[in-house]
Amino acid sequence: MTSIWSIWLEPPPGGVLEQRSGEFIRAQSARLKPHGASGAFAPHVTLVGGFECTLEEARRGAVQLAADLARIPVAPFMDVTKGGRFHQCVYMRVEPNDQLATAHAIAAEAFGVKAGNGGGSPYMPHLSLVYGDVPESEKDACVAEATAQLCGDAEIVSGWEATNVSLWRTDVGDATCESWERVELVPLRKCGLVKWARFYEDFIQRTQPP
């Protein structure tokens, strides 16, 4: 039996970012539910998502991916903004960096997903705060509130260094997010920039047309 899966980078449990962003997500999901928001979800930055396979295939892929990746800087956060997609409604943008972009490209290749943010646009790392089809006025209010509550805290804005990847079952048809579940948490390799450079060079060589 197959499911829809995602690979997430989650902030350290119990840290300021995880606690404060989680509280904000839960509060806004409840407040905006009458306006088309989804249920609450765990704070995360999606490394790659929307791939379909069996549980065993997903687990095997996540373990191999973690073995191929170094620790990933998910930092800093630039601002809070809004978007036009259900799963990119209101979110905090992460400043792109080579390691994060390379990790996304490697993950996309591993799970057979087209790299990027869709429509030919590049990967846009972000931490979602609201999912849903929410009126623009409510999005604007949420952006302002998140900016005031989250972006003024240096411990939040500074982001984190991802030391693991998490495998989540994410049925995108479930607007409540109640069926979403984490099924695996896999530590990343502890290697530095030299190995990252090799990963990047190897990836470019594999993906360049002949």
For the regions a protein language model found, what residue spans apply to each?
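Basic, often amphipathic N-terminal segments
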Residues: 1-77, 82, 94-156, 174-210
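Short acidic/glycine-enriched loop/turn segments that link adjacent beta-strands
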Residues: 86-88
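A structural signal for short secondary-structure junctions
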Residues: 158-160
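Short beta-strand segments and strand-loop junctions that repeat across beta-rich extracellular domains
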Residues: 163-177
